């Protein structure tokens, strides 16, 4: 059976993607924030220990929380960079796509 992992698959567009894949009999793991936090590389690596192979991978996590630009700190920028780039790169380098 074809397997899929949908990050951000518990609501919104990700949930719609998950439901669409399920409707064509694909075995879907819909990952939520509690399953993986792409801004935290320890969380990403822990996720990859369990979910290290799939046929389909959808990278659909949410973005940073809204905040006035003037209030964004260097720490925030590092978190956003991890969340939307480094976390995804780590996943892509370490997961086997069949």
Regions found by a protein language model. Name each.
Residues 11, 62-65:
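Flexible cofactor-recognition loop at the NAD(P)H-binding site
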Residues 67-68, 93-98:
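A short helix-coil junction within the Rossmann-fold of NAD(P)-dependent oxidoreductases
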Residues 58, 87-95:
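Hydrophobic positions on the long internal alpha-helix
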Residues 41-54:
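Conserved amphipathic alpha-helix within the SDR
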Residues 63, 70-90:
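Catalytic Tyr-X3-Lys loop
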Residues 31-42:
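Rossmann-fold cofactor-recognition segment
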Residues 10, 14-19:
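N-terminal Rossmann NAD(P)H-binding glycine-rich loop of SDR-like oxidoreductase domains
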Residues 7, 54-62, 84:
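Rossmann-fold scaffold of SDR-type NAD(P)-dependent oxidoreductases
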